[in-house]
């Protein structure tokens, strides 16, 4: 047992002298490992008598426990000291300004769509939606565009093999609303539409908003006032010049194209307005009686107006964008301007 006491004292001294955790582990292996000096004493217990063996084993285990506790305490102290040193060397200066986060923002097309919806919701209109994959009846026939009608040439349509198609405008939503309800109707139908066209001012997919109001006694004067007020709200120009030019659409009669005074040059004439001082903005007209009848509305009792516009077109003019394709390229340098 005297040898045990000497080994324990030597082990405790080396634990205190260990300069790092690796040296401390070397001490553990030297005295407590499988071939360690204190562990070797356990092998000598077999030479003792049965009466002496339990007492001797207890003494050896007590010595081993002292060394283990010393190693654990020393290791804990080393780790705490290392942590304090690390924290001291990595001190954060809380007075420095934060990095912050880059905030997101609405896409300019969504921003414009919400602005359009907000205006018409204030006027008591509802927002209606419909399928993007349409049938020929709702996209053409019900809108007074039969199969032989030359107006179909104005729509570069994507067809499926079963005769269905990708809608070329959101007007089919108006027909479906009339089919499913009873007048009066006050709705706008925003959504994606598809046409086989692609250049600086056209893409195969774009967004439209079409509006419909059907009630008793509706006249072109109601249409004119609604559209003019909407355009002044959209471009935030109180005295924005607005003019209506006679035009043709198979689903309205009479029909008109709506122009606004160029918001870039104030009507002086520039590249944006082709030096005319006016910019074509949307189409509109009084709903054709044939369309009302196709929707199950009595054209003798009710009348209404409809209008339609491309959201990207409005956004291009509102935000001064000269290439429609910029809206779809997802270039953050472009989109961040609208955040």
UniProtKB/Swiss-Prot annotation:
GO cellular component: cytoplasm
Assigned EC number: 6.1.1.20
Catalytic activity: tRNA(Phe) + L-phenylalanine + ATP = L-phenylalanyl-tRNA(Phe) + AMP + diphosphate + H(+)
Keyword Lipid biosynthesis: no
InterPro entries: aa-tRNA-synth_II, aa-tRNA-synth_II/BPL/LPL, Phe-tRNA-synth_IIc_asu, Phe-tRNA_ligase_II_N, Phe_tRNA_ligase_alpha1_bac, Phenylalanyl-tRNA_Synthase, tRNA-bd_arm
Protein residues bound to Mg(2+): 253
UniProt subcellular location: Cytoplasm
Names of required cofactors: Mg(2+)
Database matches in Pfam families: Phe_tRNA-synt_N (PF02912), tRNA-synt_2d (PF01409)
Cofactor note: Binds 2 magnesium ions per tetramer.
Assigned keywords, A-Z: Aminoacyl-tRNA synthetase, ATP-binding, Cytoplasm, Ligase, Magnesium, Metal-binding, Nucleotide-binding, Protein biosynthesis
GO molecular function: ATP binding; magnesium ion binding; phenylalanine-tRNA ligase activity; tRNA binding
GO biological process: phenylalanyl-tRNA aminoacylation
Family (UniProt): Belongs to the class-II aminoacyl-tRNA synthetase family. Phe-tRNA synthetase alpha subunit type 1 subfamily.
Subunit composition and interactions: Tetramer of two alpha and two beta subunits.
Protein name, UniProt field: Phenylalanine--tRNA ligase alpha subunit
């Amino acid at each position: 047992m005297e040898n045990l006491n000497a080994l324990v004292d030597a082990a405790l001294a080396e634990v205190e002298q260990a300069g790092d955790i690796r040296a401390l582990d070397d001490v553990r292996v030297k005295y407590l490992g499988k071939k360690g000096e204190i562990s070797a004493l356990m092998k000598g217990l077999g030479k003792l008598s049965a009466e002496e063996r339990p007492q001797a084993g207890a003494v050896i285990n007590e010595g081993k426990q002292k060394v283990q506790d010393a190693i654990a305490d020393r290791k804990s102290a080393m780790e705490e000291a290392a942590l304090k040193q690390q924290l001291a060397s990595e001190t954060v200066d809380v007075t420095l300004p934060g990095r912050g986060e880059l905030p997101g923002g609405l896409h300019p097309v969504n921003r414009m769509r919400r602005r359009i919806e907000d205006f018409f919701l204030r006027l008591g209109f509802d927002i209606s939606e419909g399928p993007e994959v349409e049938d020929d009846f709702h996209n053409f026939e019900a809108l007074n565009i039969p199969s032989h009608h030359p107006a179909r040439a104005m729509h570069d349509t994507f067809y499926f093999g079963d005769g269905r198609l990708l809608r070329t405008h959101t007007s089919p939503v108006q027909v479906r609303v009339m089919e499913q309800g009873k007048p009066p109707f006050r709705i706008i139908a925003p959504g994606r539409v598809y046409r086989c066209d692609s250049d600086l001012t056209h893409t195969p997919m774009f967004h439209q908003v079409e509006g419909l109001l059907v009630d008793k006694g509706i006249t072109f004067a109601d249409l004119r006032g609604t559209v003019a007020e909407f355009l002044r709200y959209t471009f935030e120009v109180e005295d924005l010049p607005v003019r209506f030019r006679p035009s043709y659409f198979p689903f309205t009669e009479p029909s008109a194209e709506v122009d606004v005074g160029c918001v870039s040059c104030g009507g002086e004439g520039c590249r944006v307005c082709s030096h005319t001082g006016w910019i074509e903005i949307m189409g509109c007209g009084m709903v054709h009686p044939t369309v009302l009848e196709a929707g199950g509305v009595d054209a003798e009792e009710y009348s209404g107006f409809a209008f339609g516009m491309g959201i990207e077109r409005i956004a291009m003019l509102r935000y001064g964008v000269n290439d429609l394709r910029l809206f779809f390229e997802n270039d953050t340098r472009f989109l961040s301007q609208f955040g």
